[in-house]
Swiss-Prot record:
UniProt record, GO biological process: translation
InterPro entries per record: Ribosomal_uS8, Ribosomal_uS8_CS, Ribosomal_uS8_sf
GO molecular function, one term: rRNA binding
Keywords attached to this entry: Ribonucleoprotein, Ribosomal protein, RNA-binding, rRNA-binding
GO cellular component, one term: ribosome
Similarity comment: Belongs to the universal ribosomal protein uS8 family.
Gene3D superfamilies: 3.30.1370.30, 3.30.1490.10
Organism encoding this protein: Colwellia psychrerythraea (strain 34H / ATCC BAA-681) (Vibrio psychroerythus)
Protein's UniProt name: Small ribosomal subunit protein uS8
Alphabetical list of Pfam families matching this protein: Ribosomal_S8 (PF00410)
Record function comment: One of the primary rRNA binding proteins, it binds directly to 16S rRNA central domain where it helps coordinate assembly of the platform of the 30S subunit.
HAMAP family membership: Ribosomal_uS8_B
Top-level taxon: Bacteria
Quaternary assembly: Part of the 30S ribosomal subunit. Contacts proteins S5 and S12.
Length: 129
């Protein structure tokens, strides 16, 4: 049984890039698809797809630039044993705005910039640099 599926997703992406894999696969969920959508919109991954009906699998195609991984660091912040919630004013800036923080808000998952412009806070799921 997996206790933290988001941390598992981040670990699979981190390990896949360390091993210079083209793509990584993991069990799919709505939250993982939303995170993959954010990563694609921000240019951290090439693409993703969901396949299978009984046990859906999420395949994430990793992105490299001149042989180096695009995601230098991906880290889980809020975890099941210690949730981290921040208001709009307290939302963290990752690498002075060069990275993103993934925020779970009442309006869905969004980046720290989008949450700040919408004026809403939420749970800080992780950082991507």
């Amino acid at each position: 049984m997996m206790t933290d599926p988001i941390a598992d997703m981040f670990t699979r992406i981190r390990n896949g890039q360390s091993a210079a894999k083209v793509a990584v696969q993991m069990p799919s969920s709505k939250v993982k698809v939303a995170i993959a959508t954010l990563l694609k919109e921000e240019g951290y991954i090439s693409e993703f797809s969901v396949s299978g009906e009984v046990k859906p699998e999420l395949a994430v195609t990793l992105k490299y630039f001149e042989g180096k991984e695009v995601i230098e660091k991906i880290k889980r912040v809020s975890r099941p044993g210690l949730r981290i919630y921040k208001s709009c004013d307290e939302l963290p800036k990752v690498l002075a705005g060069m990275g993103i923080a993934i925020i779970s808000t009442s309006k869905g998952l969004m980046t720290d910039r989008a949450a700040r412009s919408a004026g809403i806070g939420g749970e800080v799921l992780g950082f991507v640099e």
